[in-house]
Amino acid sequence: MLFGKKDIDLPANDLLYLLGDAPASRDWSWIRYGKGTDEWITGINLFNLPFEAGLNTNTYKYYIDFAARFGFDQIMLDAGWSDARDLFRIQPGMDMEELTRYAREKKIRLMLWTLSSTLERQLDSALNLFNRWGIETIMTDFMDRDDQEMVNFYHRVARACADHHIAIMFHGAYPPKGFNRTWPNVLTHESVLGSEWNIWSELPTPDHNVAIAYTRMLAGPLDYEPGLLLNAQRDQFRPIGKNPMSQSTRCHQLAMFVTYDSPLQIFSGNISQALLEPAFMELLGSIPTTWTDTKIIDGKTGEYIVTARQHGDDWYLAGLGGSTARDLEIPLDFLGAGDYEATICKDGRNAHNYAADYSLERLTVNGQVWLKIHLAPGGGFLVQFRKKQS
């Protein structure tokens, strides 16, 4: 059980991480973190293309080009790139040799989805194949248990991946609770009701999203996969299969990339839609996934949270709001001395009706400033602070 004097004492608590066994004494310097794209949540429902979108080489080259343009490190090849029961039976129309060559040329990494039972059966041979392709990260899915036999599977797979210098994300998984300390190549666990639930349910509400920061996040990195670009207020929302929307504003989706802790972040938005808004995507693409300092500035469980995270000399400030609109006044004293160029992305004047509405502005600030921000219902904001050279 974790304790804090205030709600905001809990989200940055790392006790469960520290309770994990220390990692084995081996070289972990090969591990790389970053941001990737996912195509499964939006059903590869792309547009403005000269080819038919789907599980084919041209589509994934399109994702690679997008990632390279907007500062992403990798793209996901989610379920379907191979037969779920045989990782060596590649989907017709997918030329993996060409895709891996093209990805290397563009300096983008490929991340592969696997079915956990298949990965276990083909573990060594599959990891050898992934090494030959230059794959550095995989996802394995549908464990859906936490008995001792399954816990042993997690350790067995993490160890084998480490031996092959491959990082891994566990989906359909129990929370890490220090597992990522024991195995640093285990970047994140899903273990959360995240973006994909917008496809078929009304469960990922703004209040739910805020509550995650005070509950699930305490157990370690989580893979929510935010970034849906079709946004709606609660009374406008409905699940729409391959064209999913969020029950929150565009800026609420953006703020999750800083609010939620995960050294591997996955953008789930439709990249054809994202290409129409380059300024927004350049800001999203700039967000780091690892941090040197974290401060929870303000918040109340299930209602809202304001988080500041530092990466090098720069800071990112994010606010995630529940279903009730609110006005915030946020001290910037965490910035310390000097001036910063602030890029502010916040709910637009009409976000209470049109949830995709947002505004972008830039100004110079310092640690003496208080920032005033209005959150629409289901709202959010993100501020990037870049240190100005004196």
Q: What residue ranges belong to the model's regions?
A:
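Carbohydrate-binding surface patches
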Residues: 300-341, 381-382
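Glycan-recognition and catalytic regions of carbohydrate-active enzymes
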Residues: 269-316, 352-356
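Conserved structural scaffold segments of CAZyme catalytic domains across common CAZy folds
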Residues: 1-106, 379-380
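C-terminal beta-strand-rich structural cap/linker in extracellular carbohydrate-active enzymes
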Residues: 362-390
